[in-house]
């Protein structure tokens, strides 16, 4: 009920006067004598205007009926129950203690108890509250004669936090009614949440509904404006009565805070709800101290209360009646224990002592009191769920042990939506469809560019002969796989898409850069051995095997990752402002770190190869495009990772950065490697990319006029530009008297030492000679060239026509 300023001032004045009176008599309070020596009096104190009052008082009368015969026959005592309303806590409590009474069941709620029990304690009258949960009542110095059968706010908050931790929620908002119960519960929630690493991002108070009159709209607007600013998704509602909750939910529906994505958890104040018939309330959760549901004793008790005692609520049963019964039953057991020991039932200290020694099974479970504070021990909470809007009340679906945090469910939890999927405690960001379409179109353009380059390579295969067109196509295929990974990022994440993204991106990366660097490694190895006049055999089959090894290693890692900790879509909190993005997540982030950082090996290896092949002849030299590709890849990784941390609060920026990083990483790499060559072919500037032959001189050279350093280094661009060396030479050319050529049956003529190769004039080339002079079948020569090219790729040195002619002449002379 709404607290009036006048009542507050009046109560303060009365308490001050009463405190002065208590201090003067030095705690020696003389209680009035009972009206009848053989009569015992139990007082029941609860707000008369509550709809639950008739059931609460009826439950107390029912408990009393269990003891009437025992007290009469065994102790010659009669016991009476006087009911009082707590319209004015101080005045009503003073009236009670001056009746006098042996004990008091009540007051019902924390606000009344916090005042009335001060008076009860001063007059040494034991009391048992059946619905007060305020944590301040546990202060034994202020409330020495206070007991309660309802678990306190501390335990209820522990039960709520157990539910939060079970669902992985770390952010919660709180709304509470502005009175003792709501204020105390909210304070406990904030204190215990902070201690357990759960953030209460906003704590909002609203006055309770007073006789059907709700607070002004302005105050509700303030509450929900703050909830919106905090991007609240999980909301704990500490409200005094169901009408308070219904009014707040009415406002929440108008502001869009009901439905899928929002979780409401109410406490015992609203767990008595009977009017939750709005379908939008489906999925609301409640915690309520266990009240015996499911036991035979509870079933009989509920039937009795509804049918036999004052009940103006139809067939509805209020859970608090179970606690009213247990509180009354405990008070009578304490008084009986005093009588059984020959004690004085009017001695409040004796009654309190026996109460705190009790342990029995009540309707709500095991009843026992803390010997120092009088708090209920063995408290257990029922987890309630609103799953039937026609019924309009909560149904129990499980139990929560607040001490251990254990939650036992007998059915799945229905969340708002309704859905059985656990919602996020963050505002889940849904990316703009228009943005996704734009990113998809850009990715599609990049895919077409790569496909176009690949088509030119396939159609102009021989013109890319010295670039190993087979491996060029491997690079194209890998780039397409990497670009395809973008299309797994744009739709709403699903488990197959989450698993497909690292597979496509990882294999695409390995194929592109594994092929590029392996092919370049072959160039380096061949030319580094050429300066030593060594012939090494590195076939295409060997290169394919190396690339396959890289792919196999990547596949093994991905298989283990997928089997052990497969990425799944979760709404992960990645933004400081209370937002989250539905993203693919594994239990351990170590998988992603390994996935990203071990690929740095490829970058380092690429830098090494680019440096080593910087002086190779132009037709085989890819150091410059590799350097550009590496620079681009390094830049993209560094900038993308840095921006990813800086812009974590911007969900749109995150997806854009991821997409652009992938597009630049693959599209630019393919472009710098192949686009210049493709352009030269398409524009007609160059008819063949292999017009400049690979001569035998590329294996190394030496003559008497060179220095030792020159004779041991590989063949360079400078050497190539200073000499025009054809594909073949004549053994009779001038200056070749010391040449010792080796006629390899597959490699052709290989220079193994001697003077420099001569500058072969145009008149000496094979193109200028007549077919009669060469006298070699072109078909035979073409077949030989094709066979060796397939095995040795661009490093095959064709058998020279001069050599073939020379061998034929030599054979003829030998025959003669």
UniProtKB/Swiss-Prot annotation:
Where is coiled-coil annotated?
Answer: none
GO biological-process terms attached to the record: aggregation involved in sorocarp development; chemotaxis to cAMP; gamma-aminobutyric acid signaling pathway; regulation of sorocarp spore cell differentiation
Question: Quick one: signal sequence residues?
Answer: 1-27
Q: Which Pfam families match?
A: 7tm_3, ANF_receptor
Effect of inactivating the gene: Cells grow faster, reach higher densities, exhibit delayed aggregates formation upon starvation and altered chemotaxis toward cAMP. Cells do not produce SDF-2 in response to GABA.
Cellular component GO terms, alphabetical? G protein-coupled receptor heterodimeric complex; plasma membrane
Stretches in topological domain Cytoplasmic: 458-469, 518-541, 612-625, 675-816
Q: What induces it?
A: Down-regulated by growth on bacteria.
Ranges per topology, Extracellular: 28-436, 491-496, 563-590, 647-653
Q: What is its membrane topology?
A: Multi-pass membrane protein
Q: Name one GO molecular function term.
A: glutamate receptor activity
**Localization per record:** Membrane
Q: Which residues are glycosylated?
A: 68, 311, 388
What residue intervals traverse the membrane?
Answer: 437-457, 470-490, 497-517, 542-562, 591-611, 626-646, 654-674
Question: Region Disordered: start and end of each range?
Answer: 697-718
Q: Which PROSITE patterns does the annotation name?
A: G_PROTEIN_RECEP_F3_4 (PS50259)
KW Secreted (keyword) present: no
- Its main localization is membrane
Does the keyword Signal feature in the UniProt annotation?
yes
Family statement: Belongs to the G-protein coupled receptor 3 family.
Purpose:
May be involved in early development in cAMP sensing and subsequent chemotactic response. Probable receptor of GABA and glutamate, leading respectively to the induction or inhibition of SDF-2 formation.
Name of this chain's protein: Metabotropic glutamate receptor-like protein E
Where does this protein come from, organism-wise? Dictyostelium discoideum
Lineage of origin: Eukaryota, Amoebozoa, Evosea, Eumycetozoa, Dictyostelia
